[in-house]
Amino acid sequence: MKDKFKHFKEMIRTRDVNKEKFNELIKNSLHDEYMYVRETALVVGDEMIDHVNDLFDNGLIIEDIKLLYEDEDTFLWKDIIRIDGKRFLTTNIQFWKDGKNWREMVGGREVSDDFSLDQITGS
């Protein structure tokens, strides 16, 4: 898939308007062998879609997002999210196979209210 970052941002905007369309867009982008590695769990396919929807349903806000790298096989970005009154800087990487998201890892840390993506080295 070309322009993964653009597609990702469009998916997020769709979630605010049409949850079913959002779910369909995610599902269509996942490889049959998809795995999502979180801090404490390994999640597959529909479980990941449910996890993402639970986050949004519980008030997740993506405050800012920055593309770090993208090519045919790799998609890497950082974002600042807010949930439960706390802000987190997350690092997200996807590995693509056969034009679909095959593996995904996310890590994060809490940041202050005045932290911005511009503070990341290399910005």
Where are the regions that the model predicts?
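A solvent-exposed, acidic/Ser-Thr-rich amphipathic alpha-helical stretch
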Residues: 2, 19-71
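A beta-strand edge to alpha-helix "cap/lid" segment located at domain peripheries
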Residues: 51-123
